[in-house]
């Protein structure tokens, strides 16, 4: 039995983590924590998230001393802001904890990336160099050896799962960059109230055009440039990405299908469509990424869907934890 701590437990992702870990037979939740200044400190997690009533009825504690909180803890999940994770992760790592960071603080091994896209100077480049990017289906062997696992972003997870098999099989024409148009539910903006995400204001619209921090994350880990445009959708949760690519001359629909089959036939949390493309409702509330595609000559359109809070965050973090400690990969997830 491993003792685990969730920091940032009051948010949407933190609540999903708590639910997964509470029903995991190998995990014992020692505490649910939030920042010392949080208005949620002292409240029951089940009062903040009523779906947890009768399941997890424990208070959310303020984190005032990370070194003290680390005592007796084996595994830490950081569902916190990027700068908060940047500051906290090294403390828990120094205490010997295995850390799964759901922020962007350790995803890209380039200090300039953080200055440009996150607005802070990275002070822990030693841990940045050691961090393993936790794209579970592709980095399992590295995850097994890691102490710090940087869980990929929600958009990058779906984009990479859709594109990596095609790039590895050299099916795409590199003269045309993949174009990723992605729509996410409002929960992707977090639980904190804002005008943009309020019920009467939310509307389908693009944002972060040419400067969203997930574009360089996707490009870096794919090893190829992409054009990425995220959109805010007028629904609560889920991500749908429509990706337009150009195939190499002579590549057939069967070649594309075989590339996906070879990559994911033994990966239980990626579901492939033999015909048609997935809809958002097929994944909301579930830990899967669903992928379908269509080919017309040299043109390829791939559609990938996931729940942004699950496969795009909490479920992938727990999947990586299962891989790291040798548990069944889908334990507590399905």
Swiss-Prot record:
**Record NCBIfam families:** argC
Signal peptide stretch: none
GO terms (molecular function) for this protein are: N-acetyl-gamma-glutamyl-phosphate reductase activity; NAD binding; NADP+ binding
In which pathway is this protein known to take part?
Amino-acid biosynthesis; L-arginine biosynthesis; N(2)-acetyl-L-ornithine from L-glutamate: step 3/4
**What is one term from the GO cellular component aspect held by the record?**
cytoplasm
Q: Which reaction does it catalyse?
A: N-acetyl-L-glutamate 5-semialdehyde + phosphate + NADP(+) = N-acetyl-L-glutamyl 5-phosphate + NADPH + H(+)
Any single GO BP term: L-arginine biosynthetic process
Gene symbol of the encoding locus: argC
Q: What is the name attached to this protein's record?
A: N-acetyl-gamma-glutamyl-phosphate reductase
Q: Which residues form the active site?
A: 154
Q: Name one Pfam family in it.
A: Semialdhyde_dh
Query: What are its E.C. numbers?
Result: 1.2.1.38
Q: Where in the cell is it found?
A: Cytoplasm
Look up keyword Oxidoreductase and say if it applies: yes
